[in-house]
Amino acid sequence: MIIKPRVRGFICVTAHPVGCEANVKEQIDYVTQHGVIEGGPKKVLVLGASTGYGLAARISAAFGCGADTLGVFFEKEGEEGKLSSAGWYNSAAFEKFAVEKGLYAKSINGDAFSDEIKRLTIETIKKDLGKIDLVVYSLAAPRRTDPQGVVHTSTLKPIGKAVTLRGINTDKGVVVDTTLEPATQEEIDGTVKVMGGEDWQLWIDALRDADVLAEGAKTTAFTYLGEKLTQDIYWNGSIGEAKKDLDKKVLTLRDNLAALKGDARVSVLKAVVTQASSAIPIMPLYLSLLFKVMKEQGTHEGCIEQVYGLFKDSLYGSEPKLDADGRLRADLAELEPKVQDAVAALWNQVTDDNVNEISDFAGYKAEFLRLFGFEIDGVDYDADVNPTVKINGLISA
C-alpha cells in the first residue's frame, strides 16, 4: 500500500514502516558517530520504550553502551493488511538493528501500569538477563488503572485560576487563544496518580523484591520544568503536580537503592516534539519559536541528542549536571536567558500573518510528521510498502 500522512488534531492516524525504520536508523547513527559511553549500563529495562525519549534511551543504551535491552510499551499491531502504530514500527526497527549488532533486544507489549506486565517483565529478566543495572521510566498516558482496579485520568489544566494561552491551530496554521478552566482537586489527584511517581516506585519495589536489580543499579524518570511561558499550564498546573510527585518519590527510591549502592534520579529534559507534547495547547507555538531561536544559536537538540548527552554527561559521567534538588539536568540550553528572552519577544509579536516568518512552524510540522515515519530523507513515499511488520522478539502477555 502507498501510505501518506493523515493528521487529526495532534495525532497522525497513519504511520510509515519504512520511514519509522529510517528514523530509528538515523538515531542509531547519531549515537555510533558520537562514541561509546564509558562505564555505561549492560542490561537495561526501558518502560515506555517505543517513541520519543524512551526510544532514545533504548537506542543510547544499546548502541552507546552495548547494552542488552528489554523494552515495555503499549502499541497497536495492525491486523493483516492494516497499519500498525509508529511505536510498533519503531520497536521492530530497533530490534532488527540491535540483533544485527549481536545484542539482546526483546519487547513486551502491554499495560506497564498493570501487575500482570510487571510479573511478566520480572520473569523475563530472570530467564534472559539475570539482573539489570538500569531502569528508565518514560511512561506518558492519559489514564492508569491502579493495583486496586481504580481507573485514574490525567488532565492538562491550570491550578487555581483559568488561564488564556496563545497557541497555533496546527491544522490551519493560525494563532489562536485558548482558555483553560482550572482543574478540580479530583482532576489534580487523578493526574498525580497517572503521571506521578507511584507507578515508578511500584516498579522499582517489585524489581528489588524479586532480586533482579544488580549492585549499583540506577533508575531515572524523565521530567520537564520549562520557564515562565509554559509554567501556568505545565509546572504550575495539574501535570506539574504529578512531576513534583516524582521529586518526592525519588527520595524514597534513592534510600531504597542505597543497600545496592544504587541511585535514583529525576532527569530534566528540554522541550521537544513528541506525541505527548503535541497534545499540550501551548507547546506547538512555544516549540516553533524555540526551534527558531535555538537553531539560530546552534543549540537545537532533539530526543536522541538530549538522551545521549544525559547518559554520557550525567547518568554515567564523572561530573553529573545536578541541580539543588538533586535532579540531573539536560535542559539548561533551553533555559538560557538569551534563549528565553528571544522566545518571549517573538511570543508577543506572532500573528497569523507572520507565524511562518518569525517561528519555525515548518520545522515543528516536519518534526511532528517524523514521529510517524514521514518527512524522512531518502524514503520514497510513493512506493508500495507492506504495512505488516513483525517484532520477532515480542514476548506475549
Curated annotation (Swiss-Prot):
Keywords: Fatty acid biosynthesis, Fatty acid metabolism, Lipid biosynthesis, Lipid metabolism, NAD, Oxidoreductase. The active site is at Y234 (proton donor). Pfam families: Eno-Rase_FAD_bd, Eno-Rase_NADH_b, Enoyl_reductase. InterPro entries: Eno_Rdtase_FAD-bd_dom, Enoyl-CoA_Rdtase_cat_dom, FabV-like_NADH_b, Trans-2-enoyl-CoA_reductase. One of its GO terms (biological process) is fatty acid biosynthetic process. It is an enzyme of class 1 (oxidoreductase). GO terms for molecular function: enoyl-[acyl-carrier-protein] reductase (NADH) activity; NAD binding; trans-2-enoyl-CoA reductase (NADH) activity. NAD(+) binds at residues 48-53, 74-75, 111-112, 139-140, 243, 272-274. Its EC number is 1.3.1.9. Substrate binds at Y224. The record marks E75 as: Plays an important role in discriminating NADH against NADPH. Pathway: Lipid metabolism; fatty acid biosynthesis. It catalyses: a 2,3-saturated acyl-[ACP] + NAD(+) = a (2E)-enoyl-[ACP] + NADH + H(+). HAMAP family: FabV_reductase. Involved in the final reduction of the elongation cycle of fatty acid synthesis (FAS II). Catalyzes the reduction of a carbon-carbon double bond in an enoyl moiety that is covalently linked to an acyl carrier protein (ACP). Belongs to the TER reductase family. NCBIfam families: EnoyACPredFabV, PRK13656.1. Monomer. This is Enoyl-[acyl-carrier-protein] reductase [NADH].
